[in-house]
Amino acid sequence: MLSAATNRLTLVEPRPVDPNASTMFEHLEYLKYRHPRTFALLDKSVISAIDAITERANRLKEIRGHGDFDEDERGAAYRGRQLAVPRAREYGDLRIFTELAKRLGGFSFKQVGLDIIGGNGTTARNASNLLPLESAPYIIAGDPCLDMVDDALARHLPAVWQCAQETLFADESLDFVVGSRGFHHVSAGARPAVFTEAWRILKRRGVVLVVDFEEGSPTANWYSEGLDRYTNAGHRFPHFQRAEFLNFLTAAGFKDIDVFELYDPFRFWADTAEGARNSLLEHLVGMFGLVKLQRESGETERDYWGRIDRIFTPWCTFAADEVAFDPEALRRLSVFQEADQRWRAEFPRVALCAIGIK
């Protein structure tokens, strides 16, 4: 994928010999050739110097906490499921865009945003699916997992190999920064630096929005208990308290700060109640790589999905006061028939949304 760009473009001479730096060098050359709008926003003092490229690339390779998205872990399954069922988290996606647009005074195709835990371009795809073409902003994915970045680039989406706490973007180059759902993968010690970095790269009146899950909540426990127990890679990452988000935003210099709950369910539709529920459960098992939840010998399909339903129940069951903030929020995994006679299965989740303005 990178060979064409490498043959045509030169950033620095001589080319780096460090293997990590060489990978970064080829990545940057590819961006310059195939994604010039993204490349133009990068910090030229970094990307034009071999020493700087080498230092950044080596620090990036040392980052831990994102390896479970590599090709040989659950990365391929995660990407595949997201692409196959783009509407599964549509309700939460729309809420995120609504809150962001409210602070920006609306969206424009001239705006440029960065998803700092962007994976393979999920936020950019969601924007193209959910926002009007004439106003959808240009959204770049940044991620420390090179497999994720390469997958985004292969799908013609702008993506940069970098970490959230040390991006490659120039000062005051972006209109908004988003950290959507995967922020807990950033190590606890690096989290304050992410907000400081967001402040640096945002334009005046730019907006930062981070979505993750409150420590101890059923949704956070889905990751720290469910994924940790039933995936090969485990999932031991601390989530957040409301006060932490407030402190991070305040210390970085943001104003008009708000931290609030956001309903972020998985939803699936089918022609039958059983089909909707089973499709939802199958999606969750596959997307999150729950390979230790296999169907047992002699277990019928009905019994298998019933067992999975019971295992998942603690991680999608809420008290009434925990979901009172949204009239559409459900308290437990539910299946019901809608007006068009189709059945909808819903796996409730509650996230924390933290927003600040520069």
What is the predicted role of each segment?
Residues 16, 34-39, 258-357:
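Conserved Class I S-adenosyl-L-methionine
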Residues 114-166:
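Class I SAM-dependent methyltransferase SAM/SAH-binding core
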Residues 7-109, 122-126, 148, 209-233:
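Conserved class I S-adenosyl-L-methionine
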Residues 237-253:
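Short alpha-helix
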Residues 192-204:
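A short glycine-rich, Lys/Arg-flanked "PGG" loop and its adjoining helix->strand segment in the class I
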Residues 178:
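A conserved beta-strand element that flanks and buttresses the S-adenosyl-L-methionine
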Residues 181-182:
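Short catalytic micro-motifs in class I SAM-dependent methyltransferases
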